[in-house]
Swiss-Prot record:
Gene3D superfamilies: Jelly Rolls (2.60.120.10), Phosphatidylinositol 3-kinase Catalytic Subunit, Chain A, domain 1 (3.10.20.90), Ras guanine-nucleotide exchange factors catalytic domain (1.10.840.10), Son of sevenless (SoS) protein Chain: S domain 1 (1.20.870.10), Winged helix-like DNA-binding domain superfamily/Winged helix DNA-binding domain (1.10.10.10). One of its GO terms (cellular component) is plasma membrane. Transmembrane segments: none annotated. A nucleoside 3',5'-cyclic phosphate 1 binds at residues 10-140. Residues 795-1028 form the Ras-GEF domain. Keywords: Guanine-nucleotide releasing factor, Repeat. This is Rap guanine nucleotide exchange factor 1. Interacts (via C-terminus) with drn-1. PROSITE patterns: CNMP_BINDING_3, DEP, RASGEF, RASGEF_CAT, RASGEF_NTER. Residues 234-316 form the DEP domain. Expressed specifically in neurons including the nerve ring, ventral and dorsal nerve cord motor neurons and tail ganglia. A nucleoside 3',5'-cyclic phosphate 2 binds at residues 375-492. GO terms for biological process: Ras protein signal transduction.
């Protein structure tokens, strides 16, 4: 009894039950839990009610059958669920075990007697099946294989957790990801432009994105394995044959090494890309098939070996009866799918080995995988490579297993690789840690007992672990590689010894063959800049394409810790730095040193303006500094020798300035005309550009007001006052969304027109009128009777191409600096608003809602064809490397209003279903969105990235790392920022390098899409198409 009570107590939420209640509840039950295999029906509807059930581990689904005999999913239950029927003599629904489960049966009569005494305590924790069945609200289906991409946290919490595809709905830019669940990510506001949210609709709290994956990954692996089996049977290599070993003759088997050779040859002959796979990667593919029971070792071994004395055979039950050779396309897709799954398997294979058995190639694989783990993102390359030798894996099969207890001596550092754990301090659960989080480090660092008890929260939780000895060894090596520079006894610069990539500048510019140097970890802002000038600038040449990484990191991130005016002031003081003269003989050397200081400043400014281009000259401080520096160089040339090359370089900078001034001095362009993108959107949008904004009053009358995009909310109110008969009473600028939500802008908020949500209206009213504001009818978007679809006018290929051209134009206008302004906080950069990023994110939301709207407004005859066409557009967009379109459409089709349309999905061809499943797999959030990052790593520029994920990564870094420690800039955080900024710049590098200056103007038809963004309206249309009683598409029974 004590053992079972202890196990139950570890389950959430039952840990709040008293011992007396648990003992009373379980007193007549068998203390040995029942183990039920996957696929077993626990009970069916209308069977006599005999038990209540307490789920200790695993997962079950409650479902019912419709009059057509189809399955209707009701609810998924996981460990800790206590479920049954109270007032019915027969079961209200059926129950299927979807993951191997352990449960305790509690006799119905006994449970009712306990419930009559302790109903107040039990009621919040029990699941009454009859209530689920009669619930009028639509259930939130959870497919056994689904997982969340943006763990439903709202506004500010959003990036501190994993993004859950099940929660991406839309994005926006005036603060953060308003629901990174991106459901409409209305307006990304980290410090939401200080806007006040009034009467937010409760129905918007719901998560409207479902990831169901119509064909599960297991089935895709089996199908791919079947294709390889058919190919092996029908080619002439005779890989499958009878083999005589030392002791016996084995029929129809294969040799491990030959299987690798055959698969390598097959890959080379069928691959349509220039990528390659190594033998170790091919081994991982066979390991995947071995793990999934498609092949087996003749002696039952569980690891695939690339050896001539390892024998395997296809599993009898799996062998394909189809003897027709598969097509080249089928083989290519199968290998591609298996190769995308294989790295995970390969990684686990390697970390299961002792460190001394890992080959250099295997250590490289482990290192690459460690780069995808969130908890290790702040560690240097050197530390990650050291961890590759020591990291191991631990797995706990059942939820409720204790990893370690409070007070124990710490022996391991843990990183959650899969699953989740509860942190329990003094008997109270304080938090939940999920994939990518780490724990147990404090006890190792301080040599103290464990401060908490850690209990697994999910079945099959898996951890990477580093033992105490190797953990401390790495710490000591890091400390040994750390150099602290002090000034008056205080740290002013902290450096770490690191490997320097070939071609990067080193400390001694005359010794460019060194393999190591120093990277800045932290320091005073001025000392970091001085370190850049002293150690990196001398080695730079004219070609900034091979720019020193540290110099680039500083320039891309300095706005976060050192404003432009501070940088310019320090450069000016460094330019006039007086060299120290020890003797008269050193006068020549001092003159040389003086010239060197001036050269460094001019070279730094050259790199700075070359990287930022027009954004450098947008700032009046840096713009005027160039002219001032030019005058100083002219004067110094008269008295110092060796200034000719400096004059040439500053002249080049000045010429660039004159060219940029022509861009900045262009006539103001119209960006948004009454909420619609103008026919020729400026590229990029400048602060002087204009939006013709419709301003509404409380009585719903309106007028059009031309507004510069950099105007504040207060200035817009004052401009509006001139058009109104208002007295001097204070006015408020209010956004009213289509769902009725009202957001009040603070007086200093800027870039108002570009951050408005789709279908929103902007009001200027006094405070008493705010409660009277309601959405208008036209904010609901198009209706079936008024909607005219462009899908009937343009084919999929052309649509995807036009979307790519337009999105490429928006991407080209967006600079990496805008990402920094957005994440640090827009209010911190009043002169540098991310207008272009606003438009890019606005477009993501627009395409996402467009795909949902078009399907819901389509006629019954055309709906399936429209759905099929969107899948086709997303597929072609992937070929164009337009990931914005790919993921916006995928998320739009995953909206609950679409995913529940079972009858529509059932008409879709299997090939389209499979294609959509592959698109959904790209949004798999595991291992820090590993699938997406691998996809991007193989792409050549230009490509259009998944912008919401970039913003999520940056916000996670910003919220998880302080910008300053003890007065020193945390430059390791800046290194992490810069790495993302570099990848963002890289995705459009071909455009920026001048390879593609002439863009084909996209058709106006695709620039502005009419959409419905009101979640309630979308669900209403969905229920009109298929009422609630219709079976749900995402219920899959195995």
């Amino acid at each position: 009894m004590e053992r079972i009570v202890s196990r139950v107590r570890r389950l959430s939420p039952l840990h709040t039950f008293s011992d007396a209640l648990l003992i009373s509840l379980l007193s007549e039950s068998d203390f040995q839990p029942d183990s039920i295999q996957q696929g077993v029906v626990l009970f069916e509807k209308d069977e006599p009610t005999e038990y209540w059930y307490l789920l200790l581990s695993g997962e079950v689904q409650l479902y019912s059958k419709t009059y057509t005999g189809d399955f209707n999913h009701l609810k998924t239950l996981r460990c800790g669920a206590l479920f049954g029927d109270l007032s019915t003599l027969t079961h209200s629904c059926s129950c299927l075990v979807t993951r191997p489960a352990q449960l305790i049966r509690i006799a119905q009569n006994h449970f009712l007697s306990v419930y009559n005494k302790h109903g107040d305590h039990l009621q919040p924790f029990i699941i009454i099946m009859h209530d689920i069945l009669t619930d009028e609200t639509p259930s939130d289906p959870i497919h056994p294989h689904s997982s969340g991409l943006f763990n439903g946290q709202r506004s500010m919490d959003l990036i501190s957790t994993e993004i859950n595809p099940s929660e991406i709905v839309s994005v926006s830019t005036n603060g953060m990801l308003s629901k990174m669940i991106l459901p409409s990510i209305p307006n990304q506001r980290e410090k939401p432009m200080n806007r006040v949210v009034v009467n937010q609709q409760k129905n918007e709290e719901r998560n409207f994105i479902e990831f169901h994956n119509p064909t599960g990954i297991e089935k895709q692996i089996r199908d791919s394995g079947g294709i390889l089996h058919r190919k092996m049977l029908t080619d002439n290599h005779q890989v499958i044959r009878d083999i005589t070993t030392e002791h016996t003759r084995v029929q129809n088997c294969m040799i491990g090494a030959e299987m690798i050779d055959w698969l390598l040859t097959l890959f080379v002959s069928t691959s349509t890309t220039c990528s390659s796979l190594s033998r170790i990667q091919m081994s991982a593919i066979w390991q995947v098939l071995l793990n999934n029971g498609l092949i087996s070792h003749i002696d039952g071994e569980h690891q695939f070996l690339d050896k001539t004395n390892s024998y395997y055979r296809w599993v009898q039950q799996f062998r394909s009866r189809n003897k027709v050779a598969p097509s080249i396309e089928e083989v290519s897709k199968s290998i591609t799918l298996l190769s995308s799954v294989a790295p995970e398997t390969l990684f686990l294979m390697i970390v299961s080995k002792p460190g001394f058995e890992r080959s250099p190639e295997e250590l490289e694989v482990v290192y690459e995988e460690l780069t995808f783990i969130k908890a290790l993102s702040h560690l240097s390359t050197m530390v990650k490579r050291q961890l590759s030798n020591f990291v191991k894996v631990e797995q706990y099969v059942h939820a409720g297993s204790v990893v370690f207890r409070q007070g124990e001596i710490g022996v391991y550092w843990y990183i959650v690789l899969k699953g989740a754990v509860e942190v329990n301090v003094n008997g109270k659960i304080v938090c939940l840690l999920r994939e990518g989080d780490d724990f147990g480090k404090l006890a190792l660092v301080n040599d103290l007992p464990r401060a908490a008890t850690i209990v697994t929260y999910e079945d099959d939780s898996m951890f990477l672990v580093v033992d105490k000895h190797h953990f401390n060894q790495i710490l000591h090596q890091v400390e040994a590689n750390t150099v602290r520079l002090k000034d008056y006894g205080e740290d002013v610069l902290v450096l770490e010894k690191v490997d320097i990539p070939r071609g990067a500048a080193l400390e001694n510019s005359n010794s460019c063959n060194f393999n190591c140097g120093y990277s800045v970890m932290a320091g005073k802002a001025e000392k970091i800049l001085e370190y850049v000038l002293e150690t990196r600038i001398d080695a730079l040449g004219d070609d900034i394409s091979e720019l020193d990484v540290f110099v680039e990191d500083f320039i891309l991130t300095h706005d976060a810790f050192m404003p432009d005016n501070t940088v310019c002031n320090f450069l000016k003081s460094y330019y006039f730095r007086t060299p120290y003269r020890a003797t008269r003989d050193s006068i020549t050397d001092s003159c040389t040193e003086e010239v060197r200081c001036k050269r460094r400043v001019v070279q730094f400014v050259y790199v700075w303006c070359s990287l930022l281009r027009v954004n450098f000259f947008l700032n009046p401080v840096t713009n005027s500094f160039v002219e001032e520096l030019f005058c100083h160089v002219i004067d110094d040339r008269k008295r110092l020798g060796g200034m000719e090359d400096i004059l040439t370089r500053i002249g080049s900078i000045r010429s660039t300035r004159e060219n940029m001034q022509l861009v900045l001095a262009r006539h103001p362009a119209i960006v948004l005309d009454c909420g619609v993108l103008s026919a020729h959107t400026p590229c990029p949008v400048l602060p002087s550009d204009v939006c013709n904004q419709i301003i509404y009053l409380a009585d719903t009358t309106c007028f059009v007001l031309p507004i510069r995009v950099d105007k504040t909310a207060e200035e817009i109110c004052e401009l509006s006052r001139r058009r109104m008969s208002f007295s001097a009473e204070p006015l408020n600028l209010v956004e009213v969304k289509s769902n009725g939500e009202k957001l009040i802008f603070s007086p200093n908020d800027r870039a108002i027109p570009t951050v408005l949500s789709l279908n929103s209206k902007l009001y200027v009213v006094n405070r008493e009128e705010i409660p009277l504001l309601v959405p208008m009818e036209d904010q609901n978007g198009p209706t079936p009777s008024s909607h005219s679809s462009i899908l009937h006018l343009i084919d999929s290929q052309e649509l995807a191409h036009q979307l790519f051209l337009f999105h490429l134009q928006l991407l080209r206008s967006t600079d990496s600096n805008e990402l920094l302004y957005q994440v640090i906080g827009r209010e911190s950069f009043p002169l540098s608003m991310p207008f272009n990023l606003d438009l890019l994110v606005r477009r993501f939301n627009e395409v996402q809602h467009w795909s949902t709207t078009e399907i819901l407004l389509a006629t019954e005859e055309n709906r399936m064809e429209i759905l099929k066409k969107f899948i086709s557009i997303a597929t072609i967009a992937r070929e164009y490397r337009d990931l914005l379109t790919v993921f916006a459409i995928t998320l739009g089709l995953s909206h609950t209003s679409i995913s529940r349309l079972t009858l529509t999905w059932s008409k879709l061809p299997p090939a389209s279903l499979k294609t959509f499943s592959e698109l959904e797999n790209l949004l798999d959030p595991t291992r820090n969105h590993r699938m997406y990052r691998l996809l991007v790593s193989k792409m050549s520029s230009p490509y259009i990235p998944f912008v919401p994920l970039i913003l999520k990564d940056l916000m996670f870094i910003h919220q998880g790392n302080k910008s300053f420690y003890n007065g020193l800039v945390n430059f390791e955080k800046m290194h992490m920022f810069a790495k993302i900024f570099r990848s963002f710049r890289q995705c459009k590098s071909q455009m920026d390098n001048g390879a593609e200056h002439e863009f084909i103007e996209p058709q106006s038809l695709i620039r502005n899409l009419r959409v419905i963004d009101n979640q309630k309206k979308l669900m209403q249309l969905s229920y009109e198409i298929e009422p609630k009683s219709a079976p749900k598409r995402n219920v899959i029974f195995h």
